[in-house]
Regions:
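Phosphate-backbone binding interfaces of nucleic-acid-interacting proteins
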Residues: 1-202, 339, 358, 362, ...
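A carboxyl-terminal module marker
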Residues: 2, 20, 27, 439-442, ...
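Mobile "lid/hinge" segments at catalytic clefts and subdomain interfaces of large enzymes
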Residues: 114-130, 135-140, 154, 162, ...
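Terminal amphipathic helices with adjacent charged low-complexity linkers/tails
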Residues: 185, 189-214, 391-420
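Glycine/proline-enriched, intrinsically flexible loops and inter-domain linkers
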Residues: 5, 23, 53-55, 189, ...
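Beta-rich nucleic-acid/ligand-interaction surfaces
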Residues: 39-43, 200-203, 455, 491-492, ...
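Extended, well-folded interaction surfaces typified by the phenylalanyl-tRNA synthetase beta subunit core
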Residues: 180, 413-579, 718, 770-775, ...
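Conserved mixed alpha/beta core segments that line enzyme active sites in large multi-domain catalysts
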Residues: 33, 47-78, 246, 259-328
Length: 803
């Protein structure tokens, strides 16, 4: 969030320097990422008055004698410009000066004539017409006539200013504006806040009727609109142009600038519809119809679906709600009547639409963090005041204010001074706390029993309980009042890893030995992750516990699966150019018995495995699982099972001792197609995921593994090449082979072949069988008998033939 120092000074009587204010903001919890001086890179550039000038013979140059006050009254400087005259004041970069971009000015000869500096254009000082009029003229920047020679150029052209680039945390959407930061500055300095003027008068009745309705109040809690006729397009005043320019925006026209100015100043996004382009004089806020299209103001076309909220006229969408207006309803030089819109839209709706369409804007950035329901009222009033002040149009009596029926109420928190001080660990005088809260626009009603009834401002939706009040108090009172103390610690004991910790460490080492790296993700994500994996609405995984005070909507529920987090890690790696990798994560998932929860959820330890890359396949993850099985002296079996997020033909469920441990396989094609990665990556990437109930896995492990002496008798190996239908699962074959005889101690698939010689719909799978008996040598007759039984069972149960 970029906030000009000069704009803050218009709203608060600031009596400290920009550097001092930066420190104060930081001490109150606002990180100033950068304090940008507008005159950065400029030194020894002063006002110079041209007292003599004559053409430099044989060149296009003009020799000037310049009065630079204390720096010299007759400094000779040559210039190639031709727009100046005697007596003009211009910027003079003297010998040894610097300009933006690291340009250094030295005295030198120009076409044989000594020049002791350079006369500057506005562009050479980093200016444009919005910052200082005349800056974009071809030639020198002509300064006001009353400029004093020798004066530093910065205050003359408005470069004696700073831009605060402030990082706004997710819980403070009210600070996404100049006014929001000004409120904090006023509280910090103990100064009054000068609210922007918001009064206006209606001057005429509407000359036509307009229909405005909201069909999705759950996604649009408040929608306000006001009709303004006889629009008069013109240039914006200099002060407004400068405000916009300091925040990185160019002036377009007075009406467009008012909407942008309101966004920056009040933090309220707004839009203006050209009523001559609104079919049926009708505005409706609704969900989009599947397949509807809209072309936005930046000339991008989007195909919509019911997950997108739109503003429509009687025929078509005219705006993406909370993101950007449509090109089919925008104002132009012929606009004569406008409907100004201010609204609040659901954060989730704007965020999902913005992400799905890849369309971001200053408006969507604010709506995604949250705009309170009182904000449209203030934003619209401010915009209408500016319409009146700049004489942009005639404000009619026709206005709309549609809500979801909920009243605007301040949050009330009943607490005591002792509770607040208990959170802080220090004693703060009661009156000091009351004064701080009042400076922050809270009201404090002291009750007869000594408790406080504190009401928060309407824009402070982040304040929920007395610990929030404690935070407000201490950040204004000063964190330096908290006395550092040593932590109370228990006596140090010589501990060690318990059985569960040892097993977890062993699991991680087994996976690391197979080339897998451990990932670590947050325990939260959003319900959108379930949509990403196409998890059905009735699935138990969707019973996620919602966080009461989430950092953001992206981290609003406790995870019930690790797979969404693992997939996001893989996508992030692909976006950053990591084309291949193997990852695992061992962490708890949080399963509620019912919602809303009335008891502690079950934290179930889970293992997730991910592999991605052109060379990875189904057997990468299966091999990792087999490595775990071998490490814990277990035998896994596999069965075909359909899961929403895995490919139906390249996935399986894992079992051990009859217990289902989890699933693994290739990411479903339709999910892969929706990933926010380049198309060539989607076409070339193989993404495989597996998720296991780690507690169920460990329940199959029979205590500590014991040393087993090697059998004195040699094991016998036999390879079988089998031909079967494509539909036959490898796991079914393995299970059938193992059940044929207790002599079979190991079964490994080592080859799969498909070819025309096998016939359509057929495949060949080659298995290596190990036969052994710890008590005796396995005879040839036993081997032949076992192999014969294996083949017979395979043919009878699965229709498999020997190749």
């Amino acid at each position: 969030m970029k906030v000009p120092f000069s704009w803050l000074k218009e709203l608060v009587d600031i009596d400290v320097t920009a550097q001092e204010l930066e420190e104060k903001l930081f001490s109150c919890g606002f990180e100033v990422e950068e304090l940008i001086p507008l005159d950065a890179g400029i030194s020894k550039v002063v006002v110079g008055r041209i007292v003599e000038m004559e053409p430099q013979e044989g060149t296009h140059l003009t020799k000037c004698v310049v009065d630079c006050g204390e720096y010299g009254h007759d400094i000779r400087i040559s210039t190639g410009a031709a727009n100046m005259k005697l007596g003009d004041c211009v910027p003079a970069a003297l010998d040894g000066s610097t300009l933006p971009g690291g340009i250094k000015i030295k005295a030198r000869k120009m076409q044989g004539v000594e020049s002791n500096g350079m006369l500057c254009s506005g562009e050479e000082l980093g200016l444009n017409d919005d910052l200082f009029p005349g800056s974009e003229v071809y030639g020198l920047l002509i300064l006001p006539e009353d400029s004093v020679p020798g004066t530093d150029i910065a205050p003359v052209v408005g470069l004696d200013d700073y831009i605060f680039d402030i990082s706004i945390t997710a819980n403070r959407p009210d600070c996404q504006s100049v006014l929001g930061i000004a409120r904090e500055v006023a509280a910090i300095l103990g100064k009054p806040l000068h609210m922007p003027a918001m009064d206006y008068n209606t001057v005429c009745d509407a000359d036509e009727t307009i229909s405005v309705k909201v069909e999705a109040p759950d996604l649009c809690p408040r929608y306000m609109a006001h009709y303004v006729r006889n629009i008069r397009m013109s240039e914006s005043p200099r002060w407004m142009k400068r405000h916009l320019a300091l925040c990185g925006l160019r002036s377009i026209s007075n009406v467009v600038d008012i909407t942008n100015h309101t966004l920056l100043e009040m933090g309220q996004p707004m839009h203006a519809f050209d009523l001559s382009k609104v079919a049926g004089r009708s505005i409706t806020v609704r969900r989009a119809v599947e397949g509807e299209k809209i072309t936005t103001l930046d000339e991008k076309e989007f195909t919509l679906n019911p997950n997108n909220l739109v503003i429509c006229d009687a025929e078509k969408p005219v705006a993406l709600a909370g993101i950007m207006g449509g090109a089919n309803s925008g104002m132009d030089d012929n606009t004569t009547s406008l409907l100004f819109e201010c609204a609040t839209f659901a954060r989730d709706s704007v965020r999902k639409t913005s992400r799905a369409l890849g369309q971001n804007s200053d408006s969507s950035a604010r709506y995604e963090k949250g705009v309170d329901r009182h904000s449209p009222e203030l934003g619209l009033a401010r915009a209408l005041h500016l319409i009146q002040e700049l004489d942009c149009g005639d404000i009619t009596t026709l206005e709309y204010d549609l809500t979801d029926g909920r009243p605007l109420e301040r949050k009330h928190i009943v607490t005591t001074p002792a509770k607040i001080c208990g959170v802080l660990g220090i004693t703060v005088p009661d009156q000091t706390m009351i004064d701080i809260l009042k400076r922050l626009e809270f009201t404090v009603d002291v009750q007869a029993d000594g408790s406080w009834d504190v009401s928060a401002p309407l824009y402070r939706e982040d304040v929920e309980s007395f610990p929030d009040l404690a935070e407000e108090v201490i950040r204004e009172y000063g964190y330096d009042h908290i006395v550092p103390t040593f932590l109370n610690t228990a006596a140090v004991t010589n501990g060690g890893l318990n059985y569960e910790q040892k097993q977890q460490l062993k699991t991680k080492r087994l996976l690391a030995a197979q080339g897998f790296y451990e990932a670590s993700t947050l325990a939260f994500y959003s319900n959108a992750e379930f949509d990403m994996l196409h998890i059905p609405a009735e699935d138990e995984a969707r019973k996620a516990i919602r966080i009461l005070n989430p950092i953001s909507e992206n981290l609003s529920v406790m995870r019930t699966l690790l797979a969404p987090s693992m997939l996001n890690v893989i996508v992030d790696n692909l976006k950053k150019g990591n084309a291949e990798g193997r990852l695992f994560e061992m962490a708890p998932v949080y399963l509620a018995k019912e919602l809303p929860i009335n008891e502690h959820p079950h934290e179930r330890q889970t293992l997730c495995i991910g592999a991605f890359g052109p060379e990875e396949d189904f057997f990468t993850v299966k091999g990792a699982l087999e490595g775990l099985a071998e490490g814990f002296d277990l035998t896994f079996t596999y069965q075909r099972e359909t899961t929403s997020w895995l490919h139906p033909g390249i996935s399986a469920a894992v079992y051990c001792n009859g217990k289902r441990l989890g699933v693994f396989g290739k990411l479903a094609n339709e999910i892969n197609a929706e990933l926010e990665i380049a198309k060539e990556q989607k076409d070339s990437q193989n993404i495989y995921l597996g998720e296991l109930d780690y507690e169920a896995l460990m329940s199959c492990v029979e205590g500590e593994l014991r040393y087993k002496p090697l059998s004195p008798y040699a094991a016998v190996k036999r390879d079988l090449a089998l031909v079967c239908d494509e539909s036959v699962a490898c796991g079914d074959i393995e299970e059938t082979i193992r059940k044929a005889s207790p002599l079979i101690t190991e079964v490994k698939l080592f080859d799969i072949y498909r070819g025309a010689n096998l016939g359509e719909g057929k495949k060949s799978m080659a298995f290596s069988l190990t036969l052994s008996d710890p008590a005796a040598e396995v005879s040839n007759e036993q081997v032949e008998r076992t192999v014969k039984k294996v083949l017979g069972n395979l043919k009878f149960k699965l229709g498999i033939e020997i190749r």
